[in-house]
Amino acid sequence: MSAHGDPIPMTAHPSGPLSGTAQVPGDKSISHRSLILGALAVGETKVTGLLEGQDVLDTARAMQAFGAEVIQHAPGAWSVHGVGTGGFAEPEDVIDCGNSGTGVRLIMGAMATTPITATFTGDASLRSRPMGRITDPLAGFGTTAVGRRGGRLPMTLTGAADPVPVRYTVPVPSAQVKSAVLLAGLNAPGQTVVIEAEATRDHSERMLRGFGAEISVESAPEGNVITLTGQPELRPQTIVVPRDPSSAAFPVAVGLIVPGSDVLVPGIGLNPTRAGLYTTLQEMGAELSFENMREEGGEPVADLRARFSDAMQGIEVPPERAPSMIDEYPILSVIAAYATGRTVMRGVKELRVKESDRIDAMARGLEACGVRVEEDEDTLIVHGMGPGGVPGGATCASHLDHRIAMSFLCCGLAAQTPVSVDDGGPIATSFPIFEPLMTALGATLTRDST
């Protein structure tokens, strides 16, 4: 359902060629971090291009609850008057993070070494997700956490009064875990060290450095060793948020799979730790080009152009690529359904603990649309049916997951018959303009009466 309402059933109808320019919203990962680091800096941080989806708005409200002044001046233009490292005030009420796993986990890290108590909750999807992967390393600083059985929300954290730095090896590749530990390390004396065997998105490291933290990243036999020196005074910044590569995946996808389409998606952040999908699509033979390559705010940026691709071939996606495209496997599985041959996605068990069990959700939905799918705990295999080969005609469960809902709506635009989702409401968490943006390209999306 929508963040605070009834389900919004939606249907995507087979559409003619899609064309035009798709201005997708600002990057969700960078938007969350801009607000949180701005709240931990001393002075005014200015942000333009902020994603104003429900997830990020929930983080903005949380920063206000912890004592920062967060102001929207115009669409996408915000300022944050920070309280300094260790300056968070104790919230008077429960912190509701809605659907956002990123938001709740980063905020837990940011408050973990300040001697205050806060209670966190979220929607039904977020309350089902495990938080032990965050609270376990935070306990090393001296933070205590009490939640529901299985380490689930609602959960109350009490920050460490006398935090000690930690040395932590991330057991499963996760930028959220890494970032939570680094944010906690900001208010711990000495050096906090995070070791990750596989590189994950590095926005936190880049942005911490930009805000004035002393942070280094070194390669070692065990992986990336990230060292943060605690208790800096973070300097406020002026941030221009690049457009979200995860959101861009949806207009790119329909450009590739709807016959005759030609879609331009400008200003997309192409951080190497986020660009795995686009590398994969090129390997499949997609008509995908990168134009006007440039750097903005320390992040590589380009305009993406996606044209209908009738010669895409299924491939084996290297499992080591998973951290750089973990959010894009749902839409990749749809694109794979319109390729020829098998697309094998291994090393994706992390998908089972996202907003939904995304492996199961995509497998069941694609099967309902007439696509042959195989899965095990760590693998998803899609047997492509070629251009225009997906029968469609199904209603797919979104499981309160924005990416599942958008993926199946994209599927329906290229299928032989319409594809519906039981609830398009969660799309607002990350991509509130998805529906008008797709419609402007020529897509036919309808909201169905319940």
Curated annotation (Swiss-Prot):
Residues involved in 3-phosphoshikimate binding: 28-29, 33, 174, 176, 327, 354
Purpose of the protein: Catalyzes the transfer of the enolpyruvyl moiety of phosphoenolpyruvate (PEP) to the 5-hydroxyl of shikimate-3-phosphate (S3P) to produce enolpyruvyl shikimate-3-phosphate and inorganic phosphate.
Keywords: Amino-acid biosynthesis, Aromatic amino acid biosynthesis, Cytoplasm, Transferase
Binding-site residues, phosphoenolpyruvate: 28, 101, 129, 176, 358, 403
Gene3D superfamilies assigned: Enolpyruvate transferase domain (3.65.10.10)
Active site: 327
Catalyzed reaction equations: 3-phosphoshikimate + phosphoenolpyruvate = 5-O-(1-carboxyvinyl)-3-phosphoshikimate + phosphate
Gene: aroA
Region (Disordered): 1-26
Pathway the protein acts in: Metabolic intermediate biosynthesis; chorismate biosynthesis; chorismate from D-erythrose 4-phosphate and phosphoenolpyruvate: step 6/7
Molecular function in Gene Ontology: 3-phosphoshikimate 1-carboxyvinyltransferase activity
Domain of life: Bacteria
Stated name of the protein: 3-phosphoshikimate 1-carboxyvinyltransferase
Record localization: Cytoplasm
Matches recorded under SUPFAM superfamilies: EPT/RTPC-like
Cellular component terms per the entry's GO annotation: cytoplasm
Annotated EC: 2.5.1.19
Principal subcellular localization: cytoplasm
Species: Dinoroseobacter shibae (strain DSM 16493 / NCIMB 14021 / DFL 12)
UniProt GO BP: amino acid biosynthetic process; aromatic amino acid family biosynthetic process; chorismate biosynthetic process
Stated family: Belongs to the EPSP synthase family.
Subunit structure comment from the entry: Monomer.
